[in-house]
């Protein structure tokens, strides 16, 4: 089995957010949607940029939005009673690596567009888990902790591709 590429980053973000006050689920999901809008814009712009100095600027901006998603997922999980969000993110990546070999968001398989859709879908699942009828026959029956964990793990996996404003692969 492949080793999770973001163990150290997950621990770093957990440490950095240790004393943060959690915000409401509404605020978190809203911030994620804002970040998704910025990420989609960055993906489009990065795809059309030929100048290296501009690519670095947008890659760093892109990285900041992914960090925002991760740190908010970390705080949300803590507020939901998860003691070690970093371990939860790593365990989720390990499950995904088995279920989707070569297609976790750190791999070269998916494009940034596909990565975006995967992250957006999971943010939507978190929102679905918070609806009034989630646990009813008319709802999605989504587990909020599991869905928030997937959001954080996906963002971390994608984030390892953008270290210091540089893409790990030209296969976007």
Say what each PLM segment does.
Residues 1-172:
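Flexible "arm" and connector segments at domain edges
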């Amino acid at each position: 089995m492949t080793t999770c590429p973001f163990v150290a980053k997950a621990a770093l973000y957990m440490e950095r957010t240790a004393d943060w006050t959690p915000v409401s689920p509404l605020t978190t999901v809203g911030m994620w949607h804002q970040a998704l809008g910025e990420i989609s814009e960055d993906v489009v712009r990065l795809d059309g940029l030929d100048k290296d100095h501009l690519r670095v600027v947008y890659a760093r901006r892109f990285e900041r939005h992914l960090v925002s998603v991760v740190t908010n997922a970390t705080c949300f999980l803590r507020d939901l009673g998860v003691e070690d969000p970093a371990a939860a993110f790593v365990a989720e990546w390990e499950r995904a690596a088995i279920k989707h070999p070569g297609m976790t968001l750190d791999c070269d398989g998916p494009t940034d567009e596909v990565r975006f859709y995967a992250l957006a879908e999971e943010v939507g699942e978190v929102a679905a888990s918070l609806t009034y009828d989630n646990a009813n026959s008319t709802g999605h029956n989504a587990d909020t902790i599991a869905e928030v964990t997937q959001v954080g793990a996906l963002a971390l996996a994608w984030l390892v591709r953008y270290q210091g404003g540089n893409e790990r692969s030209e296969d976007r």
